[in-house]
Amino acid sequence: MNPLKKKAPAKVSASKQKRKNREELNAEGRARKREKKHRGNPPGNRNQEQSGDKHPSGKQQRDPRLGSKVPVPLIVGEQPTKPVVANKVETKPRLSPQEELAMLENDDRLDALLERLENGESLSKEEHAYVDTTLDRIDALMEELGIKLDEEEREEEKQDDIMQLLKGN
């Protein structure tokens, strides 16, 4: 054995440890009691309804006292009844692009708002948004159907005239 390396001292046995006196034991007991006293829920918390903070506000909370709505057979041999199926809500049939375009072009509200704009009156944000969305939809439908505005045709004719002048010179 190397004389430089010494063994670690052995652990002190339980019998040789210093015994605690009555004051120390009482202080530890009071501390344990104080900690134990503050465990659990506050008084009166057993039947409180849960607050809506934890759950999303868009969804209405179900009452936990209400049970299932499934009918229960009262006679042992009776077959269970079939659940009632809710009728499906029919969606409105989609209009063809031609019908939708005709409907938008004959829109009285749009005509009245466009007349107000031509007269120089100002529109509210809602009215302006309605005009913009309706005109955008009309443009999309005209593109889909391959209909071009007269203004575009005139611009194309002007470009053709310019090209002919350039080629002729």
Curated annotation (Swiss-Prot):
Compositionally biased region (Basic residues): 31-40
Which Gene Ontology BP annotations are present? ribosome biogenesis
Q: Which key words are in the record?
A: GTPase activation, Ribosome biogenesis
Family annotation (InterPro entries):
YihI
Query: Spans of biased composition, class Basic and acidic residues?
Result: 21-30, 51-66, 150-161
Q: Spell out the molecular function terms from Gene Ontology.
A: GTPase activator activity
- Tell whether Cell inner membrane is among the UniProt keywords: no
Q: How does it assemble?
A: Interacts with Der.
- Family affiliation: Belongs to the YihI family.
Question: Which HAMAP family does its entry note?
Answer: GAP_YihI
Q: What is this protein called?
A: Der GTPase-activating protein YihI
Species of provenance: Photorhabdus laumondii subsp. laumondii (strain DSM 15139 / CIP 105565 / TT01) (Photorhabdus luminescens subsp. laumondii)
